[in-house]
Amino acid sequence: MLRIPVRKALVVLSKSPKGCVRTTATAASNLIEVFVDGQSVMVEPGTTVLQACEKVGMQIPRFCYHERLSVAGNCRMCLVEIEKAPKVVAACAMPVMKGWNILTNSKKSKKAREGVMEFLLANHPLDCPICDQGGECDLQDQSMMFGNDRSRFLEGKRAVEDKNIGPLVKTIMTRCIQCTRCIRFASEIAGVDDLGTTGRGNDMQVGTYIEKMFMSELSGNIIDICPVGALTSKPYAFTARPWETRKTESIDVMDAVGSNIVVSTRTGEVMRILPRMHEDINEEWISDKTRFAYDGLKRQRLTEPMVRNEKGLLTYTSWEDALSRVAGMLQTFQGKDVAAIAGGLVDAEALVALKDLLNRVDSDTLCTEEVFPTAGAGTDLRSNYLLNTTIAGVEEADVVLLVGTNPRFEAPLFNARLRKSWLHNDLKVALIGSPVDLTYTYDHLGDSPKILQDIASGSHPFSQVLKEAKKPMVVLGSSALQRNDGAAILAAVSSIAQKIRMTSGVTGDWKVMNILHRIASQVAALDLGYKPGVEAIRKNPPKVLFLLGADGGCITRQDLPKDCFIIYQGHHGDVGAPIADVILPGAAYTEKSATYVNTEGRAQQTKVAVTPPGLAREDWKIIRALSEIAGMTLPYDTLDQVRNRLEEVSPNLVRYDDIEGANYFQQANELSKLVNQQLLADPLVPPQLTIKDFYMTDSISRASQTMAKCVKAVTEGAQAVEEPSIC
């Protein structure tokens, strides 16, 4: 087992009655008193010197130490003096003892740090003017603050050959100071043992031993944790300096997790995307698709309205002409002749505006691309389609049953939580579905959905495991609900969850049943009353079809009458735009203030980082203008007014960064028994089986050259996308 952080390693362990190892919190009366530069502070036993110093606001320099990684203690930059101790100690690895007086700025501490810094700089190249880490480099900052003012090293510096670890991370290994943060991240957080050290002493190198790609959906995070410029972003190389960019706090919409991000822009262009701390969602990590797919925001964009001419070709036109044509069709056709499909990247403001517009023409055929069973309780109960336990709540669970999902590629940050709990809390995981690499061990129960019946009836051995669990979770992937027996699968999972609550020691507040969504718009659409799936449109093909960012290919021209008038509103010329008669260019998530609801039901906002390209406009504004031209004006003119309308329809949509607990009623399970559908024998196979299936899943990532390089590198090897080095 990996070495866990010192603080956790020293927590008292106790055996539960059932033999499980549990951690016990330290009582307040057991706190010990230590002194930091003469200032008293009370800390728990096992607290390190560095943590005690931080508690009183004293920052200790460090390179190898990271709060979310195990303690390595190999950079020695955090050396401090302990009063009456013979030698300085490494603050990150030394637990405090009662009565210690820690001297952080004594002559001995300063001299020790100067010596360590001198050794670190002895072989470090003077690359600062051409290094992408310049301006946000820990080595720059700490050498300025804690280092000497001159160098005594006159010999030649060592040089290390760079490693090719894929199309995302650029390596300049001569700059590496062997802090091993990247190695520990790879093995502990990402769960991929691709990185390690070879050699010793002055010959030590960090790399992959044999040349291979760093195969992880979280690989870009090693760029952030690298304290020097040894690991930088290949797509961002030599494009901008940190002080030249404007930072905008926003959220990611590439999956349904809703990771918090910072969008860095310059001169109206997105230069890079970085993670933003949110302990309850993504902590401080983001997936590679979130980080690197931003170049897709400037490719294949729809920048002007377009209409199909008499020759069947799409030609540019004015907003007035395009909206007038659409308005004419809405005035001609009413009721069931008008329908709409919402795509995976659509915000809540656009969803409610489109809903209001179609209601004005007496139509309620508003559908989502993703299917969700409506039989039984269906979408009437919010708890039926949410990750009720929450993402952070995974760390409290003791047993997790995954059904028909591959969270590693469907929701990488949710999977990282599962791994974290498995690593530190002895979480037991089981999977029903295709055997996949989840980066942690699990019990594979099989791939047949009929196993759910056995678990529900109590005849399966895993039923006993769930029964004995204190806080079990059943996580059903939304991809499993796209099947013809989706309603039966949902009913079976609901039955399992209800029986666990009745027979085990689950408390009233703990939610057992969870749905893991894959797309960012699904929860908000269901909250607003959209019908999941396009079956209603296939059964009753409309005369006018409005595709709002619908690029999933769930419906084609062949599914519709030849005279069906199709409007596509979105930001990329992907799957939906080519079949449209009118194209209305919309804004992407970095170009608008918009509301999205993640898989746990948490509403969050994107913020405007750049302006939309060309004549593109925000989606709700386009729909509002269309309603006015069609003579059915919607009653809102500003973003605040649209959000007031959102609050009228579903109040939780404007309670930002708050989760409204969804009650799971027993009636939901009773209604699920009315589902008249049988489980199929077909195996549960998630659509994103391997990392190759992870990179290009929506209109933005499909337009990204960086994501295309990743797919090529995975299938053909990292050498297939290797570019000549400039530096």
From Swiss-Prot:
Targeting signal (transit peptide) range: 1-23
Function: Core subunit of the mitochondrial membrane respiratory chain NADH dehydrogenase (Complex I) which catalyzes electron transfer from NADH through the respiratory chain, using ubiquinone as an electron acceptor. Essential for catalysing the entry and efficient transfer of electrons within complex I. Plays a key role in the assembly and stability of complex I and participates in the association of complex I with ubiquinol-cytochrome reductase complex (Complex III) to form supercomplexes.
Membrane topology field: Peripheral membrane protein
Residues where N6-acetyllysine is found: 84, 467, 499, 709
Family: Belongs to the complex I 75 kDa subunit family.
Recorded name of the encoding gene: NDUFS1
Binding site for [4Fe-4S] cluster 1: 124, 128, 131, 137
Keyword tags: 2Fe-2S, 4Fe-4S, Acetylation, Electron transport, Iron, Iron-sulfur, Membrane, Metal-binding, Mitochondrion, Mitochondrion inner membrane, NAD, Oxidoreductase, Respiratory chain, Transit peptide, Translocase, Transport, Ubiquinone
Locations listed in the record: Mitochondrion inner membrane
SMART domains in the record: NADH-G_4Fe-4S_3 (SM00929)
InterPro entries, per database record: 2Fe-2S_ferredoxin-like_sf, 2Fe-2S_ferredoxin-type, Mopterin_OxRdtase, Mopterin_OxRdtase_4Fe-4S_dom, NADH_UbQ_OxRdtase_75kDa_su_CS, NADH_UbQ_OxRdtase_ferredoxin, NADH_UbQ_OxRdtase_Gsu, NADH_UbQ_OxRdtase_Gsu_4Fe4S-bd
EC code: 7.1.1.2
Protein's name according to its UniProt entry: NADH-ubiquinone oxidoreductase 75 kDa subunit, mitochondrial
Residue span(s) of domain 4Fe-4S His(Cys)3-ligated-type: 108-147
Swiss-Prot/TrEMBL cofactor(s): [2Fe-2S] cluster; [4Fe-4S] cluster
Organism: Pan troglodytes (Chimpanzee)
Molecular functions per Gene Ontology: 2 iron, 2 sulfur cluster binding; 4 iron, 4 sulfur cluster binding; metal ion binding; NADH dehydrogenase (ubiquinone) activity
Subunit architecture: Core subunit of respiratory chain NADH dehydrogenase (Complex I) which is composed of 45 different subunits. This is the largest subunit of complex I and it is a component of the iron-sulfur (IP) fragment of the enzyme. Complex I associates with ubiquinol-cytochrome reductase complex (Complex III) to form supercomplexes. Interacts with MDM2 and AKAP1.
